[in-house]
Amino acid sequence: MLGAIAKKIFGSSNDRRVKGYRPRVAAINALEPEMEALSDEALRARTDALKAELANGKSLDDILVPAFATVREAAKRVLGQRHFDVQLIGGMVLHEGGIAEMKTGEGKTLVATLATYLNALAGNGVHVVTVNDYLARRDAEWMGRIYDFLGLTTGIIVHGLDDAERKAAYACDITYGTNNEYGFDYLRDNMKYELGQMVQRGHAFAIVDEVDSILIDEARTPLIISGPIDDRSDLYVAIDALMPRLAREDYDLDEKQRTVSLTESGNEHIEELLREAGVLKEGDLYDAHNITIVHHVNQALRAHTLFTRDKDYIVRNDEVVIIDEFTGRMMPGRRYSEGLHQALEAKERVTIQPENQTLASITFQNYFRLYKKLAGMTGTASTEADEFQEIYNLGVVEIPTNRPVERVDEDDEVYRTAEEKYAAIIAEIDKAHARHQPVLVGTGSIERSEHLAALLERHGYKPLDYSNASAMEEVYAAARDGRVTKKFAVLNARFHEQEAYIVAQAGVPGAITIATNMAGRGTDIKLGGNVEMRVTQELAGLPEGPEREARIVAIKQEIEENRAKVLTSGEPADPAAGRKTGLPGGLYIIGTERNESRRIDNQLRGRSGRQGDPGRSKFYLSLQDDLMRIFGSDRMDGMLQKLGLEQGEAIIHPWINKAIAKAQQKVEARNFDMRKNVLKYDNVMNDQRKVVFEQRREFMAQESVRETVDEMRHGVVDDVVAQHIPEDAYPEQWDIAGLRASIENQLNLDVPVEDWAKEEGIADEEIRERLRKAADEAYADRVTRNGPELMAYVEKQVLLQSLDHLWREHLVTLDHLRQVIGWRGIAQRDPLNEYKSEAFELFNGLIGSLREQVTGQLMRIEIMMQEPEAPSLPPMFAQHLDPVTGENEFFLPEGSGSFGAAGGAYGYAAQGLNTEGAVLERDPADASTWGRVGRNEPCPCGSGKKYKHCHGRYAAEA
């Protein structure tokens, strides 16, 4: 009560913050006459003048007013659009690293140009982030005209570009692209082997459009670059065939938490079925050697119980394609991890793609926190303000609309069954269509949008292709004549190619559009129709000239007439029905269910009432809807029955809206907690990721990594000595045999450690120093034989590829640890602290393994120098096999072996050892094929002796 009174007197904190921007808005407005007086050349020259001011010590804040005034004037000249005062405020919020909440149609795309231009003047690059390739291209081409006019360059990052094109786009002053492309480029950059191959040039400032969709809805979804592993398709198919044989009591399903697990009886039943099918051959299901089968069973169970076709995914062209639960868009190329996608493919009887191993991954939460400054725009952020502040340190500012919102948001109508609800929706669509009022019907899934489409067809409506010019002309003719067409369009993941047409024309008189969640659609619904879309569609083949201009004028005039019809298409007052006042015209939003998030509902509502237009929104619900069913519909159903609610009757009351809003708040709070928890765990990996990626970058930046290689070699010596000669131990307690074996295995050295150990008074420190010296001399000899320049290249490749190999294994290990760490809670131990502790130990192990792997490879590698001009030589390559596992550890790319030397060039083919001790590409019977052989390497003849004790001895004697 007191808070409400104080707010009336003093205004909200948001009002006060907005008021704080007004003086600078006035200053920008004061510069407008001066800017209008400048010629195009003089206005363009403002960019260089502002850059000079920055170079002379001024800050971006110091030049904000003239920079914004410059952009406003450029937009007027190039686009014919002038930034409103509230848009200037939005630009200031973005520049300060905040989130500007702006209603639909308030010009977010134009607002971004202000902060983008100002920050681009610093020369560090600005990334503008959109949710799909279409919007990235559209905004870059549209707003790029302003930047080009002012002398700045614009690049676009979309799917399908090669590295050279990406690098050029990132080198521009301003880069537009999708969140996925930015994230994947970052991961790919950190898998490159030369700095010059990296495409991104840093993370200075990013403006994220639809920021709530990217940083909230997709926060839990990691970006993953993966590689294929063994084919297990037979196992997926075999286990999938058993799922229909499970009874409902065999598993516990929690739709609220989206979890499923086998019951005790279910475990016994599935074990019996697995034995019958021959999948479980020995032991019990939960024996250690059967853990893979358990994993596949769990994923198959999830696929059958938690994932629904045409809601969570669709099947298209023999593929399972994920559907974004928040936007309804298809996400081709995205795959569920941990074998879940393969389980879905087995369920749907499509080709099972190989399972993948994670090579690199990052969440959007951690990627966007790389930026020194981050800002965002959306129409709906205030409901998630706490999360933006806590996780990203982003404050939300609600920007006032340029004109008051005239949309009427009605109370929900709640029916007992879905059948009654859909009957009411069809009746409401009929009434609106008869008045020529355009209707946008929002659904939660493809399945429901197609169900509603089928119901409309049963009631005499026909589907319409909005991208078909002749079909649309029929709609426009009906609008001119005042006829109803009884046509509708469906916008979901199946018809995403027509998205721009469908959304742009959804404001035509009498239009009926069924759409899955409207988050991130990015195209405004303009009452009467969209001029640009109609010109593109109808005049594509008409050249510039008087006829084209006349047609454009006619289209504009018709759209204005249609707009007038839509504005007057509201429902008149009906005193008999208890409605004393009429309901407005404009776009009518009908929601067929409430989403888990209030924000998604608000996004749907926000499609109507843009820029002061009238509009109307209403949600039709049933107790069978997901949200109502999961959150206590049984109690409400009993209450409605007691109230004597007849079939087809609805209950309408503000209390119902409040109860639903509370249920949504519960879900939002739960999802926030889940995202926070995910972030806590991911932060552990993120800290390690930053260390590894930074170390990689340092290695690539160095001309030589010899110093690092030497330190690693010394570290291996120290570890070996410490392992076999305990501190303060007596000589008779030393494990000299083990020490010798480790020296030969890890350092490829043959030294008389037994003799050293027998010397009077010798200490472990002396042995350590002798081993270091012997290892240094052996490596120096190898460098001399192979050539310092070439060895420097090989050292860097071995170091980078060994680090990558171990990092990939580390990611898998951390992932497995994360899956099981929750069980520590049963023992009253904090799983997060346990995870941090064990992840730290694993990371230390990675560092130790890197030392050993790099040292072991470099102490064995031999590089055969060959003349490059020899025509019979095969393509040059380098490879080295791990001396223990025989795995191929690194490859030098073809053609990368040219090194200037004495006016010529060298080719190389580095050869390593296989596990039997034979040198690859060498004929044991022909010594002329052996090339140079290291003294401590196995003799190529196959005797099993070291070269120095076999043919090397004969060569020395000779």
Curated annotation (Swiss-Prot):
- GO annotation (BP), single: intracellular protein transmembrane transport
How is the cofactor bound, in the record's words? May bind 1 zinc ion per subunit.
The primary location reported for this protein is: membrane
Keywords of the record? ATP-binding, Cell inner membrane, Cell membrane, Cytoplasm, Membrane, Metal-binding, Nucleotide-binding, Protein transport, Translocase, Translocation, Transport, Zinc
Which reaction is the catalytic activity of this chain?
ATP + H2O + cellular proteinSide 1 = ADP + phosphate + cellular proteinSide 2
Which SMART domains does the protein's record reference? SecA_DEAD, SecA_PP_bind
User: Origin, by domain of life?
Assistant: Bacteria
Q: Give GO terms: molecular function aspect only.
A: ATP binding; metal ion binding; protein-exporting ATPase activity
Question: What residue ranges are annotated as transmembrane?
Answer: none
- Which EC numbers characterise this protein's activity in its record? 7.4.2.8
Q: Give the family this protein belongs to, as stated in its UniProt record.
A: Belongs to the SecA family.
- Subunit arrangement? Monomer and homodimer. Part of the essential Sec protein translocation apparatus which comprises SecA, SecYEG and auxiliary proteins SecDF-YajC and YidC.
Instruction: Supply the name of the protein.
Output: Protein translocase subunit SecA
Species this protein is from: Methylobacterium nodulans (strain LMG 21967 / CNCM I-2342 / ORS 2060)
Give the gene name. secA
